[in-house]
Amino acid sequence: MATMTELEEIRHLIREFRDARDWMQFHNPKNLACSISIEANELLEHFQWKTPEESLAVTGEKKATIAHEIADVAVYLIELADNLGIDLVQAIRDKLAHNAAKYPVNKSKGSAAKYNEL
């Protein structure tokens, strides 16, 4: 018998959590996309007005809070992909291959320039 990957297990746990609360009726793609944005902005608040060094120096309770915000974004993202029938792992692989073509190492290494400015 094949074993579940960790992503499949997480997807299953998200479905169980949602379905036990009868929330599927609210979890349409538009609402999930909105929720991703809202949660991403809650994450962003933790770094607002911080220097790059300060943003790397999070510890303790602050780090745990940030981890929860990251998890909120991830949960909604995984559920959105699931609802739309998108294989998230394959989509990430495809996007990385696409970006590798747009940003070849010999032109983009050490540069923050956009692909059309390389």
For each feature predicted by the language model, list its residue ranges.
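Flexible "arm" and connector segments at domain edges
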Residues: M1-I70, A74-L118
